[in-house]
Amino acid sequence: FGMGVDQTSISTFDNSSTSIKQFVADNGETNLTIPLTANWISDGKDSYLFPTTGWYQKAALEVAIPGGDLTFYKASYQLQRYFAISRSFTLMLNGEVGYGDSYGDTVALPFYKNFYAGGVNTVRGYKAGSLGPQDIYGNTIGGNERVVGQTELLWALPGMEKSVRLGVFFDI
């Protein structure tokens, strides 16, 4: 659990995204927020580095409460499961969902709290943060929701089960 006070100042330029310019027009260049945060993690994997069975769960919530200039919330949940198919093969399934929005007088989730996808932790094969809505200049601006799924088939190399695994994956 946590509580903080954040002051964010934003400068825009001619080539700034229209969504950023609109956010500044709606909320001003400088904003104070009072975020409350809560995180919960449950780790039931049989190994930290090379799991073959078990689960990992994480839930996170951030709420910017009244008293600051902006009021919003952002929540996310992740569930990861490992299944031993044989001594050498492990199946890993991972799912993540996230959603954020504003409430009260705040018009939208601040753009700097948006969700992004792409990169080694979400959709491999894409540059980090490169997937999602784009501005007119082709820059990824993120969004207020995200759904990510990953499937991996992991193969422990004989004689090196505790140090090396190869994997085939599919991410969406």
Where on the chain are the PLM-derived regions?
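C-terminal outer-membrane beta-barrel translocator/porin domains of Gram-negative envelope proteins
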Residues: 4-163, 168-172
